[in-house]
Design a protein with these regions (language model features):
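Conserved beta-strand element within WD40/beta-propeller blades
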Residues: 1-3, 44-48, 85-89, 128-132, ...
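Short C-terminal beta-strands that terminate individual repeats in beta-propeller domains
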Residues: 21-28, 63-69, 106-113, 149-155, ...
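Short coil/turn segments that connect the beta-strands within blades of beta-propeller domains
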Residues: 41-43, 81-83, 125-126, 169-171, ...
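Blade-level signature of beta-propeller repeat domains, shared across WD40, Kelch, NHL, RCC1
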Residues: 208-238
Length: 503
């Protein structure tokens, strides 16, 4: 908050409205602060009447001058990524500056000189949006070239434009004037901005401030007379099988919210700005899959981990498997693709005709190892008698193992150094990945599982429970008689329980 005594205060307001407000920082300036922006990845940006742009650092409680233009600062706006900002000055100049690393960063410095002071300004995904008293809304490219213009000079009912804000997706713009809000949306197909029907509100008077909620669902408008109006910004709503509400707040952004009380939703957004066409909730209502014309989005709803990968339209014949907590397995036309949740790239792709969770094993950093930062391994079937092994970090084949009988189950241990597999004759085999040495360890095997968090193996052979406490010595086996069939091995709070179903 910038005050008229040239002091900027930072308040800690808490999570709830009723919490006590506490001043945590104070920055004294030599000139009046005319505008403020706070990029999510950097310090607070202050625009001053003397033309200086200053950065206020909350951790050190110190401010520094980033640059000086000798022209009154009339607007400061941050980009949606929170890595940079634009400053508008009374002489019409617009300056771009970055406060954090940005892979898509453009050249810093003066971008363009607008015809009037840019009192209303926003930084969209592809353009710089400017408006003011001349009743024009102008869109500049990132290089400062005029791309588009909407001129309302001949509209007698229109007054000067006072403020604007951009949607979190960067694809919708709201511009405020007298008793009116004008809306513009970016058309990905047409590659231009389209004007939507204006919203008129009698006795709202001049709109002096606009803010778009981070999830894109609402716009707050402040007026000259002290009123604050809250508007919904929704393209459409739908309900998925009575369990989830899908709110399309923009072409490339959807709010996915469980209808169950107390549940938190996720913001599904295309990082490339593509229009989201289809959203599905899958995997026991724990995962989502969405499509755009050029990409596919997958996500873990419980951990709010979202991924977007390039994906051409293949007719919608994909099959999805969510048995692994770390990766989504996508099977299409004989090809298996692995997508790690939270990563915007395909982890790996292999050819296989056997798409069964029991015939594929993926380990993604399941257990930390000393001296190993990334450990990602894949085991799958080339044919019913051949197991292939892949290192997904470096993208090369670790080797293959051929068996004399058809394989019906396989699983890597958590470190990816050992592989257990069982054949149709119920023979259990162990393979060391480093040496590619295969050892037969058990006959008549009806159940087998690695104990979570360890290299201990539990299996069943006829009426015996077999345990390997040291898998490095497979000949050392502990056998206990049981009555029934083992159905699961559970490890909780440092204890391991074997679940047996009585016959």
């Amino acid at each position: 908050m910038a005050q008229t005594d040239n002091i900027v205060f930072v308040y800690k307001i808490g999570d709830d409205f009723g919490e006590k407000k506490v001043i945590c920082n104070k920055f004294i300036q030599t000139s009046a602060v005319t505008c403020i922006a706070w990029p999510s990845e950097g310090p607070i940006i202050l625009g001053c009447a003397d033309g200086k742009i200053r950065a206020a650092h909350c951790k050190t409680n110190k401010a520094q001058t980033l640059y000086n233009t000798d022209s009154y600062v009339c607007s400061v706006v941050a980009n949606n990524a929170g890595t940079g900002f634009l400053s508008g000055h009374a002489d019409g100049s617009i300056v771009r500056w970055y406060v954090a690393e940005d892979q898509q960063a453009k050249k810093q410095g003066k971008v363009v000189v607008h015809s009037i002071p840019p009192y209303a300004m926003a930084w969209a995904s592809q353009h710089i949006c400017v408006a003011g008293p001349d009743k024009k809304v102008v869109f500049y490219t990132q290089d400062g070239m005029m791309a588009q213009q909407f001129d309302y000079f001949r509209d007698a009912t229109e007054k000067e434009f006072t403020t604007m804000c951009i949607s979190p997706s960067g694809q919708a713009l709201c511009v405020g004037s007298y008793d009116r809000l004008r809306l513009y949306s970016w058309s990905q197909r047409k590659n231009l901005w389209e004007e939507n029907k204006a919203k008129e509100f009698q006795y709202l008077y001049s709109v002096t401030a606009l803010a778009w909620k981070k999830d894109g669902s609402r716009i707050a408008a402040g007026s000259l007379c002290g009123g604050v109006e809250l508007f919904e910004s929704v393209l459409k709503r739908s309900v998925w099988k009575g369990n989830f509400e899908l709110t399309y707040v923009g072409p490339s952004q959807v709010l996915v919210k469980p209808l169950a009380a107390g549940s938190r939703g996720v913001i599904l957004k295309s990082i490339y700005g593509y229009e989201i066409e289809d959203v599905r909730i899958m995997g026991g209502d724990s995962y989502l899959v969405a499509r755009t014309p050029e990409t596919m989005l997958v996500g873990d709803l419980g951990r709010n981990l979202l991924s977007e990968i390039p994906w051409v339209n293949s007719g919608g014949n994909e099959k999805y498997y969510f048995d692994n907590d770390n990766v989504c397995m996508i099977f299409n036309a004989g090809e298996l693709s692995l997508v790690e949740y939270g990563k915007n790239e395909i982890l790996g792709s292999v050819r296989t005709e056997f798409m069964n969770p029991h015939l594929i094993s993926v380990r993604i950093n399941d257990r930390k190892q000393r001296g190993v930062e990334e450990n990602k391994k894949l085991a799958y079937l080339l044919d019913l008698k051949t197991v292939a092994l892949e290192d997904l970090v470096f993208g090369y084949a670790l080797g293959q193992v051929t068996h004399d009988s058809k394989i019906d189950w396989l699983e890597l241990n958590e470190t990816g150094r050992k592989l257990l597999f069982r054949d149709k004759r119920s023979r259990l085999n162990l393979m060391d990945i480093e040496t590619m040495q295969k050892t037969s360890v058990l006959n008549y095997c009806t159940f087998v599982q690695w104990v979570p968090g360890s290299d201990v193996v539990v299996a069943q052979s006829r009426d015996n429970m077999c345990v390997w406490y040291n898998i490095e010595a497979p000949e050392r086996i502990t056998m206990l008689p049981i009555k029934g069939d083992i159905v699961d091995v559970v490890r909780e709070e440092g204890k391991t329980e074997v679940v047996v179903q009585a016959c």
